[in-house]
Design a protein with these regions (language model features):
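Short, acidic/small-residue loops that bind anionic groups at enzyme active sites
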Residues: 93-95, 183-206, 254-256
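Glycine-rich phosphate-binding loop
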Residues: 158-196
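Long amphipathic alpha-helical segments
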Residues: 1-78, 87-88, 92
Length: 256
């Protein structure tokens, strides 16, 4: 990217002032400082957490992000706020189940690999879809394998080959949170477990599932916070990029 900017300055298609603006690490908009070098430092652009922000603030942020990035993602955004943004940015797509608002400039070329999003039950879909949309917006192919919880293990076994073929799996479960441990004993790829807040009384809004996953006897299972589909998918995407870096060919300059 830096070489391209310098070349544009040299041939006159970009002024020095414009080049300086493009190379700035962040943009100060008063209420927010947008990190434009996030992708160069960490591999993916800055993601917007929608809760607690006004629709106007979200719109301002995404309009800035899309100028310098190939994708933009807002998580935990209500339908009302999403519609406000879409009235200006009509090419942004809202996923009502995941509560995400996403824009992708163009889909990356497929290399045949993928992340598996494994979900225990339909009640966990909001978290699973947040994970799936996050990975897809970051340019990572996804296979959705839903409603394969431990109450009907035959459903999981019917899909086990597809899960085994994934580079990494995100496993979402509520109630007692048993699915990641079961899956961990069946596959060789790493599993990122996501406890959800779905369950009755002693589930304690996901605490019981979280503790079950943290105490898993199965090797290869790591755990993120309750309902954090985004965090699981982000880490899965980092693993995917490391494994497939030669095929992906990401030539972004790293700037500290």
């Amino acid at each position: 990217m830096i070489d391209d900017i310098l070349e544009q300055v040299q041939n006159g298609s970009l002024t020095a002032v414009e080049a300086k603006k493009k190379l700035e690490s962040y943009e100060n908009l008063g209420f927010v400082k947008i990190d434009h070098h996030r992708k160069r430092r960490q591999g993916f652009p800055e993601i917007v957490f929608g809760e607690g922000k006004t629709a106007e603030q979200i719109l301002t942020i995404v309009q800035s992000l899309r100028i310098r990035n190939d994708s933009v993602l807002v998580t935990r955004i209500s339908l009302e706020k999403a519609v406000f943004v879409q009235n200006v940015c009509s090419d942004f797509e809202y996923n009502e189940i995941a509560r995400t608002l996403a824009w992708v400039k163009e889909k990356p070329k497929s290399i045949g690999a993928y992340i598996a999003i494994v979900c225990a039950g339909t009640s966990d879909l909001a978290v699973a879809e947040e994970a799936a949309v996050t990975a897809e917006t970051l340019g990572i192919p996804v296979r959705r394998i839903y409603d394969v919880g431990v109450a009907g293990l035959h459903r999981l076994l019917d899909n086990i080959d597809e899960i085994r073929s994934a580079t990494v799996s995100v496993c979402v479960a509520g109630m007692e949170g048993a699915l990641p441990s079961v899956l961990g004993g069946l596959v060789t790829n790493p599993i990122i477990a996501v406890p959800t807040s779905i369950g009755y009384g002693a589930n304690f809004n996901g605490l019981s599932a979280l503790l079950s996953m943290l105490n898993s006897c199965a090797s290869g299972v790591s755990v993120v916070n309750i309902d954090n589909g985004f965090g699981a998918a982000y880490n899965a995407a980092l693993i995917y990029k490391l494994v497939h870096e030669k095929e992906i060919n990401d030539d972004e300059d790293i700037i500290f």
